[in-house]
Design a protein with these regions (language model features):
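Cytosolic, long alpha-helical scaffolding segments
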Residues: 1-220
Length: 220
């Protein structure tokens, strides 16, 4: 029979998965919005759901820390969850920023580079895999997410080059800047997915890549 502590950890996993799913949804919606889909309000609503979920998970983590006083790997897991939800909340904010930009992109009838859509797909996958790595305690998977960030960065650099060429030809400078900022927000979402994966790695090993956050050693 599961202990109360084990049930709380399971609830934490469920809540993290739910918040991760909301992040996946809001990224996909933002990609649709820049292509003219009427989903801007849904993006803002989902961002609010993410904010609410962050507060709920914070409260759960604080209850676990105060009442259960976990040690070693369990403590790292709860501590990592607190850091992860901060990055997930930022993903929602940046998707909302993309939604704001989409209004101007649509108004100017600008064709959106396919690479921006590819960036959205990559970041959705990275968020999914980083959350899976947390729940499954899969060190290999979280390191894959960290490595995959290079693909998002490469795509962003290609978008910059493509937009520079289009602006040199006949693309309106304001429209080009809006598209560039959209790609930049997607690139930042990828960075947040990496941050999530790095905190998963910390939860599993006790060592953060920045070597600033070490707690409980490298043993479970």
């Amino acid at each position: 029979m599961a202990t109360h502590f084990e049930r709380q950890l399971e609830e934490l996993h469920v809540q993290i998965i739910t918040m991760g799913s909301l992040c996946e949804k809001v990224i996909s919606l933002s990609n649709r919005a820049i292509r003219g889909d009427k989903c801007i309000q849904e993006i803002f609503d989902t961002d609010k759901e993410i904010d609410t979920k962050e507060r709920e998970i914070e409260n759960l983590c604080m209850r676990i820390l105060l009442h259960q006083q976990p040690v070693a790997r369990d403590l790292r897991e709860v501590s990592a969850a607190l850091k992860m939800i901060s990055d997930m909340e930022r993903i929602g904010d940046q998707a909302a920023d993309i939604a704001d930009l989409s209004k101007f992109i649509e108004a100017n009838h600008v064709e959106v580079p396919e690479l921006i859509g590819s960036m959205a797909e990559m970041t959705v996958r990275m968020v999914t895999e980083s959350i899976d790595a947390f729940v499954k305690k899969d060190l290999k998977l979280c390191r894959k997410v960290i490595d995959d960030d290079d693909q998002v960065d490469d795509a962003f650099n290609q978008v910059k080059e493509e937009l520079a060429k289009l602006m040199y030809q006949n693309l309106d400078a304001k429209a080009g800047l809006d598209l560039l900022m959209t790609a930049k927000y997607m690139e930042r979402i990828g960075d947040h997915a990496v941050n999530i994966a790095e905190w998963v790695e910390y939860a599993l090993t006790g060592i953060h890549r920045n070597n600033e956050h070490q707690m409980g050693g490298s043993q479970a």
